[in-house]
Amino acid sequence: MDSNTVSSFQDILMRMSKMQLASSSEDLNGMITQFESLKLYRDSLGEAVMRMGDFHSLQIRNGKWREQLSQKFEEIRWLIEEVRHRLKITENSFEQITFMQALQLLLEVEQEIRAFSFQLI
């Protein structure tokens, strides 16, 4: 993962962790956890692409690779919808900027994961 994406993830996670949403901190903590999980998954796919031979061992170790990939895309779609919803309801400019950047990052990561998965298939 390039350094800009890493710093974007870190920046957004840090800012989201400081936010106090009116609805529920549990919802936000869930989003943060999914962001972190998505980052780790994206990193592991990127590493597998770099070492194409490892993909075969990944498939052997994990016969449910495609199922996991499908699940990650569902998580991304859920996060995108959740971020869009938060963006619509928030009036705080700090939160709006954070959620706009989170949305942009999610769309970029979705594109990267798609590209990696096509290379691995």
From Swiss-Prot:
It comes from the Viruses. The keyword Phosphoprotein does not apply. GO terms for biological process: exit of virus from host cell nucleus through nuclear pore. GO terms for cellular component: host cell nucleus; virion component. Keywords: Host nucleus, Host-virus interaction, Transport, Virion. SUPFAM superfamilies: Nonstructural protein ns2, Nep, M1-binding domain (SSF101156). It holds the Pfam family Flu_NS2. InterPro entries: Flu_NS2 (IPR000968). It is found in: Virion; Host nucleus. Disulfide bonds: none annotated. A motif (Nuclear export signal) lies at residues 12-21, 85-94. Interacts with protein M1. May interact with host nucleoporin RAB/HRB and exportin XPO1/CRM1. HAMAP family: INFV_NEP (MF_04067). Mediates the nuclear export of encapsidated genomic RNAs (ribonucleoproteins, RNPs). Acts as an adapter between viral RNPs complexes and the nuclear export machinery of the cell. Possesses no intrinsic RNA-binding activity, but includes a C-terminal M1-binding domain. This domain is believed to allow recognition of RNPs bound to the protein M1. Belongs to the influenza viruses NEP family. Average number present in a viral particle is estimated to be 130-200 molecules. This is Nuclear export protein. It comes from Influenza A virus (strain A/Chicken/Hong Kong/96.1/2002 H5N1 genotype Y).
